[in-house]
Each structure stands twice: as structure tokens, then as C-alpha cells.
Regions:
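Residue(s) in the substrate-gating loop at a strand-loop-helix junction
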Residues: 180
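The beta1-alpha1 cofactor-binding region of Rossmann-like NAD(H)/NADP(H)-dependent oxidoreductases
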Residues: 78-80, 99-110, 142
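Conserved glycine-rich cofactor-binding loop
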Residues: 46, 53-54
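Active-site helix of classical SDR
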Residues: 160, 196-199
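Substrate-binding pocket helix/loop in short-chain dehydrogenase/reductase
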Residues: 136-137, 141-146
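SDR active-site lid
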Residues: 213-284, 289-293, 299-309
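Conserved glycine-rich Rossmann-like NAD(P)H-binding loop of the short-chain dehydrogenase/reductase
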Residues: 67-83
Length: 352
């Protein structure tokens, strides 16, 4: 009798263990199955990309065009847009360009209406327009903070508010917000940039929760340094030549940055599956992890780094100077070659 009871208990235990293992496997597999179920085919989809005439925006456009998408590129500079059309000539029947300042809500609303009328219903919005201004805190003005907030926070919000009603009506959509690792971990000499990118991360994560019920998936992208060639058009204050040299070298070296085409590919994949968040580069993921463990320690370490960065100088330049006007013996040089080459490929040199 005892033997039979023991066998019954043993078999019950084995069944429970088996069910537990099956349950664990199901729980582990569920996210992947759900992700696969959200897969979006970009063929014949209309994608609107702000800041699409150069840099990362242009790289994302290339990737999407190869997958059959039709792209609407938005930028402020008509000449840049024209050059972008020439660069993408092989896909010209699926490339449309629109002049638009994303900091002007009326312009954004008008442009979205034009895109939907002239090109088609917008399935994907990529909020990519951005600016970078580097320099010590002492050289940054309130206008600098306002300008970056207008571009990195209000611009994406205006575009999102303009496209969301249509996406809700069709019960389908994707919104990709290009923030930065600086939107998760603040770094010295980029205060206005960091503050505005933090604001975009908060907006983007909240939008995902709000729009989930409408089958509109919002992806927050936080890249580390990328070789887009944007250092040429970045702005520098204080000792601008030293700031530019450091920035362009960090932006170029393979140990600190990633190829922009690779980054664009990762962004397109995250958009395809409606992922919640994408942090690009191993260095950026490490910074995020360390910051999560001890934000104070990371901030203090950056404080030590800041001691060795260029100061404001005896006569700080309050007016920002473009990278293309801040050249020195260090930049351009062999140490910045990869980023300099990217600036040619990604239409960053046109206005310089």
C-alpha cells in the first residue's frame, strides 16, 4: 500500500514538474510569438521621416526603400532635399520630399495633410529631425535649451498628433522616435541636447502605453555614437575647435561609434516588429546598465571627465560655430576619416 502511495506521489510530482517546465517554456516563448505576430511588411507602405534629407534619416530611407516602402522626406532646406532626391534616384518613383520646419505646428499639420493627399496614408512615422550643440554649461543660453526642446520634443509631438488620428482609424501604425543614449544618461557639454532627449524618451514611452490599445506601436530608439557624418553640421561653443576635434574623433573611431547603415538596419527591424525600445551600440547599453545600477556613481564619473574637457575659454564664444567652420590639425585627420567619409555619403556636406 505504501509502495503504491509512493508511486502515486512520485508520478504526481513528475507531472507537476513537467507542467511547470511546459509553462516556463510557454512564458519564455510568448514574447517572441507576440513579436512575430506584430511583424509589419513595409512593401507599399508610406513612411514619413522628419530630418530625412541627410544623416541617419537618409540612411533609414535607403533601408526602407529597398524593402518596397514609399518615403516622404521632410526637412527645412530645399537644396538638401533636392540632393537627397538625386542620391535616391534609383528609387525616384517612391521618393517624395517636403519642405517643413517641425518646430512649427501649422507647417507640420499642413505637410502631413499634403503627404496623405499626394502620397498616401501614413503607416509609419519616424521622428528623426534633430540638432547637436556642444559646449560647456557656461556657454549655453536659455535660447539653446528652447531651440533643442522645440526640435526634439515639440517637433515629434506635433508630428505624432498629426498622424495618430489616421493610424487609430485604420487600427494600425508605427511611430519611431529617435532619441539618444543621452536621453537616458546625461553627459557633459551637451546639456540642452540631453535635457531635450530625456523629454523625448518620457514622451515616447508614455505614447506607447496610450496607443497600444489602438494597435499603434511606438518605438523609442536611443543610439550611442554613430558615423552619420553629422559632426560637420553639429554646432560648437566655447573653444569650438577643441570641442569639434574631440567630438569628431569620438564620432569616427570604431571603438566608440557604429556605422550609420548598421544602425539604420537595427532601427528598421525594431520598427518592423513594434519593439518598445532599442539601445544601439554596446557602449550605450553598458552606459545604460551602469546608470541603472548607480546613477550617482555614473554622474560623478562624468563629472571627473568634465574636468579634462575644454573650458569655456577666456572669451567664450556665445554664438555657435558649425563643425565645418571649426577645423584644426586634429580634425579632419586620419582619426576622423570614417565619419568624414560618412558625411559625403549621407548628404551632410551640401551647405558647407
Amino acid at each position: 500500500m505504501k509502495s503504491a502511495e509512493g508511486a502515486t506521489k512520485k508520478s504526481g510530482l513528475l507531472i507537476a514538474m513537467g507542467l511547470g517546465i511546459l509553462g516556463a517554456v510557454a512564458v519564455a516563448a510568448a514574447p517572441k510569438m507576440i513579436r512575430r505576430g506584430r511583424r509589419l511588411d513595409f512593401d507599399n507602405k508610406v513612411v514619413m521621416i522628419t530630418g530625412g534629407s541627410r544623416g541617419l534619416g537618409l540612411e533609414i530611407a535607403r533601408k526602407l526603400l529597398r524593402e518596397g516602402a514609399t518615403v516622404a522626406l521632410l526637412a527645412r532646406d530645399k537644396a538638401e532635399l533636392r540632393r537627397a532626391e538625386e542620391i535616391l534616384e534609383a528609387f525616384q518613383s517612391r521618393v517624395f520630399t517636403f519642405e517643413c520646419d517641425v518646430t512649427d505646428q501649422a507647417q507640420v499639420n499642413e505637410t502631413v495633410a499634403r503627404v496623405e493627399l499626394e502620397v498616401g496614408k501614413i503607416s509609419v512615422l519616424v521622428n528623426n529631425a534633430g540638432l547637436i550643440q556642444a559646449g560647456p554649461m557656461e556657454t549655453q543660453t536659455l535660447s539653446d535649451y528652447k531651440r533643442t526642446m522645440d526640435t526634439h520634443f515639440w517637433g515629434p509631438l506635433y508630428a505624432t498628433l498629426a498622424v495618430v488620428p489616421g493610424m487609430k482609424e485604420r487600427n494600425c501604425g508605427r511611430i519611431v522616435n529617435i532619441s539618444s543614449i543621452a536621453g537616458l544618461v546625461s553627459v557633459p557639454h551637451l546639456l540642452p541636447y540631453c535635457a531635450s532627449k530625456h523629454a523625448l524618451v518620457g514622451l515616447s514611452e508614455g505614447l506607447r502605453s496610450e496607443l497600444f490599445k489602438d494597435n499603434v506601436f511606438v518605438t523609442t530608439v536611443c543610439p550611442g555614437l554613430m558615423r552619420t557624418g553629422s559632426h560637420i553640421n553639429a554646432e560648437f561653443k566655447g573653444q569650438n575647435k577643441k570641442e569639434f576635434a574631440l567630438f569628431s574623433m569620438m564620432d569616427s573611431l570604431p571603438v566608440t561609434s557604429i556605422d550609420s547603415a548598421q544602425a539604420a538596419g537595427e532601427i528598421v527591424e525594431a520598427c518592423r516588429y513594434g519593439d518598445d525600445k532599442l539601445v544601439i551600440t554596446m557602449q550605450a547599453r553598458a552606459a545604460e546598465a551602469f546608470h541603472a545600477l548607480s546613477s550617482g556613481f555614473v554622474s560623478d564619473m562624468f563629472g571627473l571627465v568634465n574636468i579634462f574637457l575644454p573650458g569655456p575659454g577666456k572669451d567664450p564664444k556665445i554664438d555657435a560655430v558649425k563643425g565645418s567652420q571649426s577645423k584644426s590639425s586634429f580634425s579632419p585627420s586620419f582619426m576622423t576619416k570614417l565619419a568624414d567619409d560618412a558625411s559625403v555619403r549621407n548628404n551632410e556636406l551640401g551647405s558647407n
